[in-house]
Amino acid sequence: MMTRAIFLDRDGTINVEVGYLNHPDQVELIPRAGDAIRLLNEAGFKTVVVTNQAGIARGLLQEELLPAIHQRLSALLDQEKARIDAYYYCPHHPEAAIEQYRIACQCRKPFPGLIRTAAADMGIDVARSWVIGDKSCDIELAHNVGAGAVMVMTGYGKTELALHEEAQRQPPHHIAADLYAAAQWILRESR
């Protein structure tokens, strides 16, 4: 049987937004993020990070450091008895400073590549899954793949929601104060 997943944006949703996070020491959980992910783990959802990492394309982050950043995030979550099942990222940007990353790809959110790859790898039923993030591209991604969309007001959430509404884009299914509130709402909706 296909499994359900929560596709999570990383920066500003799980960990504190610091601009271009480029070192494991900069990783700091947003309050209650670990509790939120633990609730989702306990409810049987796969938890999958899907993140644009344009800092790689812009030369602000070495791609080789990304595994260490994700290990640090996983270690912090482990202390709260929470886990991320997989990490998927896009290192590209159409205006990248580094030529090898300067492509118009299908993996950069809101394009569906990261979720399609994760779904194929992990046997995920996307129609029974959710995307949670703090940016308009996360909400557009959810709509593009047919998943539920929850926008959080941490990170860039408040600014991005205003821009999203101003552009008259399809709204999220729910707006939550933070990842914990988003998880609680999804668990109520998914009974």
Model-derived features: where do they sit?
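Short acidic-hydrophobic, aromatic-tinged amphipathic segments that line or gate anion-handling sites
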Residues: 173-178, 182
